[in-house]
Design a protein with these regions (language model features):
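Short amphipathic alpha-helical coupling segments at ligand-binding clamshell hinges
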Residues: 26, 30, 221-228, 314-327, ...
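Glycine-centered hinge/linker elements that transmit conformational signals in sensory
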Residues: 167-168, 208-243
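Short, solvent-exposed loop/beta-turn-alpha elements that line the ligand-binding surface or hinge
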Residues: 93-114, 200-224, 274-277, 287-298, ...
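Conserved N-terminal structural module of periplasmic/extracytoplasmic solute-binding proteins
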Residues: 1-85, 103-109, 155, 331, ...
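Short helix-initiation/N-cap motifs at beta->coil->alpha
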Residues: 47-56, 160-162, 241-255
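Hinge/lid segment of periplasmic solute-binding proteins
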Residues: 77-138, 193, 282-286
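Long, aromatic- and glycine/proline-rich binding clefts that accommodate carbohydrate-like moieties
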Residues: 286-288, 338-405, 436-459
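Extracytoplasmic/periplasmic substrate-binding proteins
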Residues: 189-192, 196-199, 227-319, 325
């Protein structure tokens, strides 16, 4: 068999996470397998620093050299929609439009209809799937079940009231424990808790029915969450490490026995369970507790998705689309990686494959993330908010919570100031889009220091 004289190159840009650079390796291997299956193509995977990713894509777009496929983090959905090519047209096209109703592309079965429902909903705008989920996570509760049962609690708490009761029982049982529960002061958890209550962070249905013009840190749902959080801390039940985005610090507090419960990303299920085993206790993984007074409206996701460049010639476009389907076929979409961190599989077929192989029987702690997402109703709340300057805006809320917990600032007054700061950041982004173009690489969104230090994969 002769090699084609000139191969069609498909450039793929993925995020490089400073502490976990090996996460790109499985995708490179899958791209190499795609190249063997389709010798007329050469898929090239490049890793770009996560903090610089949107800016680098914007600069490449301005130069006319943007990648054919770009993996945007969920915090940059608005930027991905706003970026333009040198002629001022949107850089990306929807995957739905590009697929055009086909059932397979270059022999690769199209998997759009098999994507887990709320993942598909999260990346759907105006009825079209804008981008393909690449990895997905949610937020879960990790419980030292040995400590809970010793305190007379048979099962992990599922509501805020049950968390309070569990913390009180733990405090009465073991006065040496620093607190009953811990979690990082991070924007994604604010967003989850607001969504669980059916609340919104922005107008126009969280930016889903139109561009967000107003952010809301003063909603009843937000104030209910941060008030409950503050009160847990005041009662000595919540352990704050004193640092924002301190995922590792909270995980260590849980592993060391300083807290009997931990709220954290589903990506960390493997490391958390292994750390607990090493420490000599059992972990039970369950859904993220919700506000029983508001009822349960669902949880949202985080992660990355693959965006397809518009205006490609047909062979390049179809090669890129075929690669997207290949990366999400049942085997590749299982997303079980050697480094021990696990994303939620992106398709129902991949979940079924793992189940048929007995993987969940051997690793039951990975199942709650799937169960939580499957029971989450589709709504503007659970689709999550979309707005520009996402990272600085969420950082404003994190700083406000820090000031409430550490300095005892008045909660309502402090979050009112944070709301004003967040609104200013949103207005700055809107002015930037209006006065320039989103492809100049000089937009106002910058990764705050707390974000630069984080090493979350899906969060």
């Amino acid at each position: 068999m002769h090699e084609p004289a000139e191969k069609i190159t498909i450039n793929v840009w993925l995020n490089r996470w400073p502490m976990w650079q090996q996460l790109v390796d499985p995708i490179r291997k899958q791209a190499a397998e795609f190249n063997r299956r389709h010798p007329q193509y050469r898929a090239v995977v490049e890793a770009v620093n996560v903090g610089a990713f949107p800016r680098e894509v914007a600069r490449a777009a301005r130069a006319g050299t943007a990648p054919h496929i770009a993996a945007y983090q969920y915090t940059y959905l608005q930027e991905a929609q706003d970026i333009r090519d040198p002629d001022g047209r949107p850089l990306f096209t929807s995957v739905t439009k590009a697929v055009g109703g086909r059932e397979e592309i270059l022999g690769e079965p199209v998997v759009l209809d098999d994507i887990v429902a709320n993942m598909r909903a999260y990346y759907t705008f105006d009825g079209d799937l804008s981008s393909m989920p690449r990895n997905t996570s949610t937020v879960l509760l990790y419980s030292n079940i040995d400590a809970l049962r010793a305190a007379g609690i048979a099962e992990p708490p599922s509501t805020w009231a049950e968390v309070e009761a569990a913390c009180a029982a733990l405090a009465g049982r073991d006065g040496a424990r620093r607190a009953g529960i811990t979690w990082p002061n991070f924007g994604w958890l604010f967003q989850q808790s607001v969504a669980q209550q059916g609340g919104l962070l922005a107008d126009h249905e969280n930016g889903r029915s139109g561009r967000s013009e107003k952010v809301d840190f003063m909603s009843p749902e937000m104030l209910a969450y941060v008030t409950w959080w503050r009160d847990l801390h005041r009662a000595g039940h919540y352990l704050y490490t004193g640092k924002q985005s301190d995922w590792w610090g909270c995980m260590e507090a849980f592993a060391n026995g300083d807290a009997a419960m931990l709220v954290s990303s589903s990506v960390e299920t493997g490391p958390i369970v292994r750390a607990a085993r090493k420490a000599g206790f059992r972990v039970q993984v369950s859904r993220m507790p919700y506000n029983e007074r508001a009822g349960y409206a669902g949880n949202l996701i985080a992660g990355e998705s693959l965006w397809l460049r518009d205006g490609l010639d047909e062979p390049t476009r179809d090669g890129a689309l075929a690669l997207m389907q290949f990366l999400n076929n049942p085997r590749n979409a299982t997303s079980i990686y050697d480094h021990g961190r696990t994303f939620v599989p992106t398709t129902e077929a991949s979940i079924d494959l793992l189940a048929s192989e007995g993987w969940f029987d051997q690793n039951p702690h990975y199942r709650p993330a799937i169960d939580q997402l499957r029971i989450s109703p589709d709504s503007p709340a659970t689709r999550g908010a979309v707005f520009g300057n996402f990272l600085p805006i969420q950082s404003a809320g994190m700083q406000a919570m820090h000031d409430v917990l550490v300095d005892g600032e008045d909660l309502a007054a402090r979050f009112s100031r944070a709301n004003a700061q967040a609104q200013q950041l949103l207005d700055e982004y809107a002015q930037h889009v209006e006065s320039a173009t989103a492809n100049d690489g000089q937009g106002p969104q910058k990764m705050p220091q707390a974000e630069a230090e984080r090493i979350r994969l899906g969060a």
